[in-house]
Amino acid sequence: MSAKLERLSQTLRDVLGDVVESLVVDRGEVTIEVAAGNFLDVARRLRDEAALGFEQLMDISGIDYSAFGNGAWQGKRFASVAHLLSVKNNWRLRLRVFADDDDFPVLGSLVEVWPSANWFEREAFDLYGILYAGHPDLRRILTDYGFVGHPFRKDFPISGYVEMRYDPEQGRVVYQPVTIEPRENTPRIVREENYGDVGHG
């Protein structure tokens, strides 16, 4: 581990203490995990503590862990991951929090801490169904009006539930049940002796 990452890790331990449930340094990045109940308090401290100074939110991602490790995952299903930047210290940090309820995932909104969280949280809500309590305008941002479900969830069918097409008789776009037959989507890799002409020329 580099001296820079060691210094960041130690500063996080010193400032946040026991509220950090997990601190992992992997592939040159630091990830901390906190409980949902401590999420907003930790976010404010990461921003406001002079020793840390994570004044910039770079991104928020939703994650569905239900099929992680080929289904061997035993933890909570939905997580939200915030990617933070301290310009002053030239540090990057990943802050991960799991929603307590797999059936109705709710987390606190980071919009009051970092206003740039607005559209990122809307995206995670739209694609994963993670609700952000306190968000000023939590509505879909990428899918169509009236879209049913959350397409990045692992249990969402690849072909979806409905398809749309233009109906010339009605002069508009109409929705109808999916007509595509479901299929197993298993990648095939060609393993021929001279595949790709490797080693020739």
Curated annotation (Swiss-Prot):
Domain of life: Bacteria
Record key words, sorted: Cell inner membrane, Cell membrane, Membrane, NAD, Quinone, Translocase, Transport, Ubiquinone
GO CC terms of this entry: plasma membrane
Enzyme nomenclature, EC number: 7.1.1.-
Annotated compartments: Cell inner membrane
Cross-referenced Pfam families: Complex1_30kDa
InterPro entries the UniProt entry points to: NADH_DH_suC, NADH_quin_OxRdtase_su_C/D-like, NADH_UbQ_OxRdtase_30kDa_su, NADH_UbQ_OxRdtase_CS
Catalytic activity entry: a quinone + NADH + 5 H(+)(in) = a quinol + NAD(+) + 4 H(+)(out)
Entry membrane topology: Peripheral membrane protein
GO MF annotations in UniProt: NADH dehydrogenase (ubiquinone) activity; NADH:ubiquinone reductase (non-electrogenic) activity; quinone binding
Main location: membrane
HAMAP family (alphabetical): NDH1_NuoC
Quaternary state and interactors: NDH-1 is composed of 14 different subunits. Subunits NuoB, C, D, E, F, and G constitute the peripheral sector of the complex.
Free-text function comment from the UniProt entry: NDH-1 shuttles electrons from NADH, via FMN and iron-sulfur (Fe-S) centers, to quinones in the respiratory chain. The immediate electron acceptor for the enzyme in this species is believed to be ubiquinone. Couples the redox reaction to proton translocation (for every two electrons transferred, four hydrogen ions are translocated across the cytoplasmic membrane), and thus conserves the redox energy in a proton gradient.
Family per record: Belongs to the complex I 30 kDa subunit family.
Name of the featured protein: NADH-quinone oxidoreductase subunit C
Organism: Azoarcus sp. (strain BH72)
